[in-house]
């Protein structure tokens, strides 16, 4: 048979218990629950050695002195395979083409089986047959999932004639007749046209006893049909969608389950069920702390450990502990075993993690699936795209603990700390350009990026010159430093760098690619976005206003103050900023002059300006300029 068969060891006995039916008692029981259960008083034990591991019970006509035995055979087929393959046949000369209507059972997976029974008047009543099966053969937990139902297929009925009763040794296996055997069957018109009866068999554990099964036999309505449905077109109504495809189990090879969505195959049902949840959107397991849902209990347990701080997976080589086993395996590969199981088939690259190998493969294929939504940038992995998006938002999450300078990338901050604040950090000098680098790894990157010879010629952006070394190209392009090669086609604007021209062209196109994530404002330049974030969305921002000593007008930038003083007081000498590039305010300037000229009185003009500045500084917000008014003026 094409379906996988469940082996039944020879030597097991199946005990059939049946009691003579009393119509009165059966009618009372039928009114209660529709299923009569009869206590077994007499038993017949018969050993069946089946070649194909099928259970066969011989059928006889009910004689008063004989025990009544039902002819019953079950065929173990694939539980999830709705389309039947290779349905067996009985070698009986008289046959009729019949089909049964299978009722739909709610919540029960209908499994295919074949059942035939000799017709007799007692069949109008529902029978109950109790079969005792050893627990070693069918464990109770498996019996709860076994249900046998009738298939839509040709079923042959056994006659009351003992000569037509199938032999035990010859009919244990259901065989489909060959072409020459079909010719020996009598024509359909010659068969005795009478009402045939077919039964539905259900298998479930008996109440109170786990080692016995109750077979409930019910009637099914039958109809004659001209052409029997094909074996491969047989379907059971109400059956659920097929999940695992169970392959045929051969000798020496374990049974395997194959996924219908992807090529995944597993020999364990538990592993297969865990894989099936990957294709499902159901997340039934909910975290009671943050209400986050997960597909499996294992994922939920690992997530709860992050809340409680539990780290059950401990490294045996050090004192480190981790939440998941995957983190422990990755730690051991990086720190102890140095194993790199993922190797590239195109080069000598090897990686500890599969994700890094997938990212490396994209360097060969040129694929960049992660695209920036605000510019033409594309990356091979999501991390670099996230880092690039900070250039649009102006976010700088990394801060130097010494000088509080902020950076977009953590690597840039580490280089800054090593070069600016490292006291005993060794310095590495480049042998080609005398550049001093703090870390040896950064020196290797410097040599690879700037001083390695490229097979392709790199063209200068300003002239047709070409170079094979990036450092030589950079040095050459510096010769064009004072040349304004980039000119605007719509106005007379010219600049030295291409990026400045791109920023200028946004004035003509109206493009504002830099947006604030807090208030959804858009800006043409990144610097304007940075100033906006610092002014309006930084709670620790303290405005540093620069005061004009002549008109008491305040400015947030030193350059704006210098531009204003050229118009306001062209004869006055501009104050230069100090070494720290901090703006020199009017108060600082007066204090500095007082420090240099202690005991000398100020000139009348300076004294008047000083009193005027103090008066302006002491004004209340109702009579003077507030910070909010100044910011609004700056935006205008």
UniProtKB/Swiss-Prot annotation:
Known tissue expression: Testis-specific.
Keywords linked to the UniProt accession: Chromatin regulator, Cytoplasm, DNA-binding, Metal-binding, Nucleus, Repeat, Repressor, Transcription, Transcription regulation, Tumor suppressor, Zinc, Zinc-finger
Compositional bias annotation for Acidic residues: 160-170
Cellular location(s): Cytoplasm; Nucleus
GO molecular function terms noted in the UniProt entry: DNA-binding transcription activator activity, RNA polymerase II-specific; histone binding; RNA polymerase II cis-regulatory region sequence-specific DNA binding; sequence-specific DNA binding; zinc ion binding
GO biological process: establishment of protein localization to chromatin; genomic imprinting; transcription initiation-coupled chromatin remodeling
Keyword Zinc in annotation: yes
Cell wall biogenesis/degradation found in the keyword field: no
One Pfam entry name: zf-C2H2
Composition bias type Basic and acidic residues, residue spans: 568-583
Main location: cytoplasm
Biased segments, Basic residues type: 242-251
Zn finger (C2H2-type) start-end: 257-279, 285-307, 313-336, 342-364, 370-392, 398-421, 428-451, 458-480, 486-508, 514-537, 546-572
GO cellular component: cytoplasm; cytosol; nuclear body; nucleus
Annotated spans, Disordered: 17-38, 160-195, 222-257, 562-624
Function recorded in the entry: Testis-specific DNA binding protein responsible for insulator function, nuclear architecture and transcriptional control, which probably acts by recruiting epigenetic chromatin modifiers. Plays a key role in gene imprinting in male germline, by participating in the establishment of differential methylation at the IGF2/H19 imprinted control region (ICR). Directly binds the unmethylated H19 ICR and recruits the PRMT7 methyltransferase, leading to methylate histone H4 'Arg-3' to form H4R3sme2. This probably leads to recruit de novo DNA methyltransferases at these sites.
Record text on subunit structure and interactions: Interacts with histones, PRMT7 and SETD1A. Interacts (via N-terminus) with BAG6/BAT3.
Similarity comment: family membership: Belongs to the CTCF zinc-finger protein family.
Protein's recorded name: Transcriptional repressor CTCFL
Organism whose genome encodes this protein: Mus musculus (Mouse)
Lineage, highest ranks first: Eukaryota, Metazoa, Chordata, Craniata, Vertebrata
């Amino acid at each position: 048979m094409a379906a996988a068969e469940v082996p039944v060891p020879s030597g097991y006995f199946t005990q059939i218990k049946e009691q003579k039916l009393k119509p009165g008692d059966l009618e009372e029981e039928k009114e209660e629950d529709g299923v009569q259960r009869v206590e077994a008083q007499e038993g017949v034990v018969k050993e069946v050695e089946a070649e194909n591991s099928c259970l066969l019970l011989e059928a006889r006509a009910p004689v008063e002195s004989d025990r009544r035995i039902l002819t019953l055979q079950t065929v173990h087929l694939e539980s999830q395979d709705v389309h039947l393959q290779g349905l067996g046949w009985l070698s009986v000369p008289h046959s009729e083409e019949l089909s049964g209507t299978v009722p739909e059972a709610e919540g029960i997976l209908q499994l295919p089986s074949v059942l035939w029974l000799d017709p007799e008047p007692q069949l109008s009543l529902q029978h109950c047959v109790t079969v005792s099966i050893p627990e070693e053969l069918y464990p109770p937990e498996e019996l709860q999932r076994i249900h046998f139902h009738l298939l839509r297929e040709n079923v042959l009925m056994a006659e009351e004639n003992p000569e037509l009763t199938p032999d035990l040794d010859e009919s244990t296996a259901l065989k489909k007749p060959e072409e020459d055997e079909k010719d020996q069957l009598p024509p359909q018109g010659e068969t005795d046209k009478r009402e045939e009866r077919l039964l539905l068999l259900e298998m479930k554990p008996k109440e109170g006893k786990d080692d016995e099964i109750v077979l409930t036999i019910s009637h099914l309505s039958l109809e004659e049909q001209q052409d029997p449905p094909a074996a491969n077109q047989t379907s059971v109504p109400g059956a659920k969608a097929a999940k695992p495809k169970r392959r045929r189990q051969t000798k020496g090879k374990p049974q395997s389950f194959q996924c219908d969505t992807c090529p995944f195959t597993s020999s364990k049902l538990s592993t297969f069920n865990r894989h099936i949840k990957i294709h499902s959107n159901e997340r039934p397991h909910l975290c009671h702390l943050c209400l986050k849902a997960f597909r499996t209990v294992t994922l939920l347990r690992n997530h709860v450990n992050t809340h409680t701080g539990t780290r059950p997976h401990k490294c045996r080589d050090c004192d480190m502990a981790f939440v998941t086993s995957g983190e422990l395996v990755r730690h051991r590969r990086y720190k102890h075993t140095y194993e790199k199981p993922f190797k590239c088939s195109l080069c000598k690259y090897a990686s500890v993690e599969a994700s890094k190998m997938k990212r490396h493969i994209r360097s060969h294929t040129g694929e960049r699936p992660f695209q920036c939504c605000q510019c033409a940038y594309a990356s091979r992995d999501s991390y670099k795209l996230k880092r690039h998006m900070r250039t649009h938002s102006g976010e700088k999450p990394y801060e130097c603990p010494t000088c509080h300078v902020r950076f977009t990338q953590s690597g840039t901050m580490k280089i800054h700390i090593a070069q600016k604040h490292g006291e005993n950090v060794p310095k590495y000098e480049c042998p080609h350009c005398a550049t001093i680098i703090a870390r040896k790894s950064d020196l290797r990157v410097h040599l690879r990026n700037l001083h390695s010879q490229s097979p392709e010629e790199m063209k200068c952006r300003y002239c047709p010159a070409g170079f094979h070394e990036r450092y030589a190209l950079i040095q050459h392009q510096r010769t064009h430093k004072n040349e304004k090669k980039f000119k605007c086609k719509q106005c007379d604007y010219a600049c030295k760098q291409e990026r400045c021209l791109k920023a200028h062209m946004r004035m003509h196109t109206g493009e504002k690619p830099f947006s604030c994530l807090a208030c959804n404002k858009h800006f043409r330049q990144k610097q304007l976005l940075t100033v906006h974030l610092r002014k309006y969305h930084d709670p620790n921002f303290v405005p540093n206003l620069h005061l004009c000593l002549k008109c008491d007008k305040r400015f947030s930038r030193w350059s704006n103050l210098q531009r204003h003083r050229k118009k306001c007081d062209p004869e006055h000498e501009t104050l230069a900023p100090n070494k720290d590039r901090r703006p020199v305010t009017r108060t600082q300037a007066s204090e500095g002059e007082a420090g240099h000229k202690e005991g000398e009185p100020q000139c009348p003009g300076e004294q008047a300006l000083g009193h005027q500045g103090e008066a302006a500084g002491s004004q209340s917000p109702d009579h003077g300029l507030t910070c909010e008014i100044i910011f609004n003026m700056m935006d205008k």
